[in-house]
């Protein structure tokens, strides 16, 4: 049996720069079909206009609604082949700037999505007055949260709060979309050690590596596997996409 955990170990020894460039090109090639897609109404609300973080945000993102729509289409182009695919309906995205702890989080449901972005995090990210660094971080965080709005979810295994596999898939895919679109600082942002069950960047870099080295459609197929492998599991999805000779255990 080919063991995916051995492939993952090899991944940790390989530089990821070429990986990110390759995946970004594939997403760019697929982007045009999403230009007219209805991403849902974008409602931007600044709940902390008195903060320095708010002032900084408006300077780097002068048209938040258009910017959010652009990044939403990037997410869609990464997760799906075309608007004809089975895509969760998103009617509205209420995006807020808030003077609270944390970084950013997605909430809501049934097509009404909420996302907050912390002005405190903006201020911390701008501590060195590095506009480019803050813009890079803001885009990366947004890609992650928008993925939660449009991604498919595992079926037959519980929920985000009750099942670790469900959680690892959801957070791993969100960071995979961020990795795939150059939203992290290349190999420097890749965690050392760990495995796919750690979710977030550890899983995200692994999923993108599988796309680059095993199947160029891996991210889209992995997302779609939640509809085709029920009850869903990492091992079942890997076999479904790459073949029965592969195992993740």
Residue ranges and their predicted role:
Residues 1-25:
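Bacterial Sec-dependent N-terminal signal peptides
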Residues 25, 203-249:
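Pan-zinc metallopeptidase signature
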Residues 36-62, 120:
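Acidic/histidine-rich, surface-exposed loop or edge segments in extracytoplasmic proteins
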Residues 55-117:
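Auxiliary, metal-adjacent structural segments of Zn-dependent hydrolase domains
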Residues 76-96, 157-165, 186-192, 218-225:
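Surface-exposed patches in mature extracellular/periplasmic domains of secreted proteins
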Residues 121-142, 157-166:
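Short pre-active-site segment immediately N-terminal to the catalytic Zn-binding motif
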Residues 140-153, 171-175:
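Active-site recognition of the HExxH zinc-binding catalytic motif
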Residues 161-203:
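Post-HExxH zinc-binding segment in Zn-dependent metallohydrolases
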């Amino acid at each position: 049996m080919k063991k995916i955990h051995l492939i993952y170990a090899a991944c940790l020894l390989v530089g990821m720069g070429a990986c990110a460039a390759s995946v970004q090109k594939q997403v760019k090639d697929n982007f045009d079909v999403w230009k007219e897609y209805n991403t849902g109404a974008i409602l931007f609300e600044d709940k902390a206009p008195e903060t320095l973080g708010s002032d900084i945000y408006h300077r780097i993102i002068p048209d938040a609604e258009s910017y959010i729509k652009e990044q939403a289409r990037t997410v869609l182009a990464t997760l799906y082949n075309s608007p004809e695919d089975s895509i969760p309906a998103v009617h509205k995205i209420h995006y807020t700037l808030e003077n609270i702890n944390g970084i950013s989080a997605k909430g809501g449901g049934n097509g009404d999505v909420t996302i907050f972005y912390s002005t405190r995090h903006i201020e911390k990210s701008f501590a060195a007055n590095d506009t480019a660094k803050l813009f890079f971080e803001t885009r990366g965080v947004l890609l992650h949260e928008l993925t939660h709005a449009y991604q498919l979810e595992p079926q037959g295994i519980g929920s985000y709060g009750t099942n670790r596999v469900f959680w690892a898939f959801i957070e791993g895919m969100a960071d995979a979309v961020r990795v795939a679109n150059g939203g992290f600082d290349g190999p420097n942002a890749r965690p050392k050690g760990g495995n796919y069950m750690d979710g977030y960047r550890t899983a995200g870099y692994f999923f993108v590596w599988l796309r680059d080295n095993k199947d160029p459609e891996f991210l889209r197929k992995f997302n779609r596997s939640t509809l085709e492998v029920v009850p869903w599991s990492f091992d079942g999805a890997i076999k479904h996409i790459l073949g029965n000779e592969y195992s993740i255990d």
